[in-house]
Amino acid sequence: MLTKYFDELKCELGQALTIPHKPYHPLIKQVKRDIKSMAHITGGGISENLPRALPDGLAASIDLSSWDIPILFKLLQKLMEVDVNEMFKVFNMGLGMILIATSKGAINIQSILPEVIVIGEIQKRNGGEQVIFG
């Protein structure tokens, strides 16, 4: 399967899986004064990594329509026949780093790094999950 060429990827699956991610350090260095917290989304996906960046009394409400999930993850989901909720528990779904900032900080971050998108908001947690997908 790894050596199979997929038109939607324009390469073999194995090649797509080994493309290095963008280094975050130079970008974060530019906006560190506006960052309140951050989460590197690695194994465990958003569901397991983002809560580590939040105090107990807060939750992150994530708007799933705020970014385009890369075709690689859509293809993996189809090939593995995995539920989308499971995908968010395992993969970063295209979000390798999540920064948490105030509204004003987010505006400043976007003025410096225009590729940064707002994917949700932090809210008080009244029990329940610490990451809410909607």
Annotate each language-model stretch with its function.
Residues M1-L2:
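Glycine/GP-enriched mid-protein hinge/lid loop-to-helix segment characteristic of carbohydrate kinases
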Residues Y5-G134:
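Glycine-/charge-enriched secondary-structure boundary and capping motifs
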